[in-house]
């Protein structure tokens, strides 16, 4: 029963942290990027020139026939039941992923798949939330899913962030405020027609839903001095690059061949009692290798062995978090080794640059900065805000505004 509760807790937290999920152990390195901007959340403009590129690997050279299926979702990510597919999709659903290539000269053989939205078979007609399912056509099993957003930017949203918060000044927190102008959208009942979300570094486990506005008028809303828009500053993400299997690269202490696979060891993660600035990517990742040619099919898979020096926590678990963490939740849980006094985890990852952090997930399923990592007001964080709108008589929620700011 205790193990079941632990798995459920991890599942709830880690699934909320990643918009992208893989459900097959053979599917790896799922990534969704808008306009080659691998540092930002997956948000596209409606009827603009934006494109969403989705890639993943299947660990074999046996080509599978995969199809992708799109679903429009409400503001809370439940499927939209009150509109028809023809309302939001121009073209066809359930299309085959036609672009794939086999890996070249890699120890771990894999097939790399790629698709782009929009394309000549489908185009989106409504703003809002979308979920894309990748399905094995032979078994009809869903092997992965990707969540992304489409915004129409019909409302004006302005954001600000400060370290002078309502609970401390230049302490361990940061606070967000924002203002919303309705533009030409008709709003007669704010509680029924407007939904808002604010989050830190694109992490859904930091979502702040429907904060109460500090002021309301016929032109818009203001959200200032709201305590639920106070966030832990946390610490800068850690990082490493595995660019070459013949020698260590940035952040890697050593790399070796064990007779069956490559084993890479990032430097031991020591406690961070004071803040030290280090430019990071807030959990993002980028696939490449030292040759930097055909990275998607020439980069190999290596086992990355994480080691964290921290006092043992007697409640909850320690997990590794990043936008690349799309597999089963237990994959990213660290185990405490009594002999070495370290938390450890080994994860199979593709060569490239990785940004990550350690989180403490308490027994109530809430994630916190790990105590040994610290939480500092100086930490560079990105904040995102989304505003959803439902007009009078409309049957679904539209994403009418999206904004992102960086607090340095």
Regions flagged by a language model, labelled:
Residues 75-77, 122, 136-143, 203, ...:
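Short acidic/polar inter-strand loop motif in beta-rich domains
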Residues 107-137:
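Ligand-binding face of N-terminal immunoglobulin V-set domains in extracellular IgSF glycoproteins
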Residues 18-47, 153-167, 279-293:
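Short, compositionally biased P/S/T/A/G/V-rich stretches that sit at domain boundaries
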Residues 150-173, 376-401:
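Low-complexity, Pro/Ser/Thr- and charge-rich linker/hinge segments at domain boundaries
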Residues 264-314, 399-408:
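Basic K/R-rich, polyanion-interacting modules in nucleoproteins and related proteins
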Residues 88-113, 204-211, 305-351, 363-391:
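Aromatic-rich carbohydrate-binding modules that target alpha-glucans
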Residues 1-20:
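Bacterial Sec-dependent N-terminal signal peptides
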Residues 25-72, 169-180, 293-306:
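Contiguous beta-strand segments within globular domains
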């Amino acid at each position: 029963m205790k193990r079941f509760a632990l798995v459920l807790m991890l599942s709830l937290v880690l699934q909320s942290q990643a918009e992208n999920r893989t459900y097959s152990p053979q599917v790896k390195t799922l990534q969704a990027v808008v306009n080659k901007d691998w540092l930002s959340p997956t948000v596209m403009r409606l009827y603009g020139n934006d494109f969403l590129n989705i890639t993943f690997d299947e660990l074999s050279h046996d080509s599978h026939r995969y199809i992708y299926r799109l679903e429009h979702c409400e503001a809370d990510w439940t499927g939209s039941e009150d509109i028809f597919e023809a309302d939001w999709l121009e073209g066809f659903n359930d299309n085959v992923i036609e672009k794939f290539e086999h890996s070249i000269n890699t120890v771990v053989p894999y097939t790399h798949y790629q698709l782009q939205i929009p394309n000549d078979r489908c185009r989106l007609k409504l703003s809002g939330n979308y979920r894309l399912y990748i399905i094995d056509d032979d078994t009809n099993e869903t092997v992965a899913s990707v969540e992304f957003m489409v915004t129409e930017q019909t409302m004006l949203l302005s954001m600000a962030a400060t370290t002078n918060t309502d609970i401390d000044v230049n302490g361990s927190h940061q606070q967000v405020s924002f203002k919303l102008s309705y533009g030409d959208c008709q709003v007669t009942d704010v509680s029924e027609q407007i939904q808002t979300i604010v989050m830190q570094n694109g992490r859904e486990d930091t979502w702040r839903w429907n904060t109460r506005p500090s002021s309301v008028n016929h032109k818009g809303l203001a959200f200032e001095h709201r305590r639920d828009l106070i966030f832990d500053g946390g610490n800068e993400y850690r990082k490493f690059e595995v660019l070459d299997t013949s020698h260590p690269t940035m952040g890697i202490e050593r790399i070796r061949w064990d007779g069956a696979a490559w084993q890479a060891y990032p430097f031991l993660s020591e406690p961070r009692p004071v803040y030290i600035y280090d430019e990071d990517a807030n959990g993002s990742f980028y696939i490449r290798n030292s040759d930097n040619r055909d990275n998607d099919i020439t980069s190999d898979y290596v086992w990355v062995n994480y080691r964290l020096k921290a006092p043992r926590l007697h409640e909850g678990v320690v997990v590794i978090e990043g936008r690349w963490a799309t597999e089963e939740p237990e994959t990213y849980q660290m185990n405490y080794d009594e002999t070495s006094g370290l938390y450890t985890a080994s994860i199979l990852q593709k060569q490239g640059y990785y940004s990550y952090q350690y989180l403490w997930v308490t027994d109530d399923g809430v994630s916190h900065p790990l105590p040994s990592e610290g939480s500092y007001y100086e930490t560079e964080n990105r904040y995102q805000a989304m505003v959803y709108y439902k007009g009078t008589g409309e049957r679904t929620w539209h994403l009418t505004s999206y904004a992102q700011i960086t607090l340095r």
